[in-house]
Every structure is written in C-alpha cells, then in structure tokens.
C-alpha cells in the first residue's frame, strides 16, 4: 500500500494527525486530508516535509 500517515510537529515531536492518508489538497487557507475509508479532516497549517519512502507527511500549524 502507498498511503501515508500525517503528523503534526508539536513541541519538537511528531504527533499522529491521520493514518492511511490517500488524498491531500489545499482548500482555501486549509489543507484537506482524506483517508482510504473516505474520512476527511481539515488542517490549518502547511506541509513542512513529504517523506515519500517513509510514507510520512509532516505538517506544521499556522
């Protein structure tokens, strides 16, 4: 499987925000993440890093 997990940087550590992310798209001033089951979450921040081999998306809050 090629899904990624999305993490938020808090206090210098990675905190899991969403598992099995299938889609990530800008939506106004937010990011929309959708997992393989169709669950959607919105995030106010930006992408710091995409670690594709590790299947990780690193996010930072605004």
Report each predicted region and the residues it spans.
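Compact, glycine-rich, soluble single-domain proteins
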Residues: 2, 6-62
């Amino acid at each position: 499987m090629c899904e990624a997990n999305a993490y938020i940087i808090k206090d210098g550590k990675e905190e899991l925000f969403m598992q099995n992310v299938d889609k990530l798209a800008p939506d106004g001033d937010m990011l929309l993440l959708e997992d393989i089951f169709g669950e959607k979450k919105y995030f106010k921040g930006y992408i710091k890093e995409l670690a594709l081999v590790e299947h990780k998306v690193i996010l930072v809050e605004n």
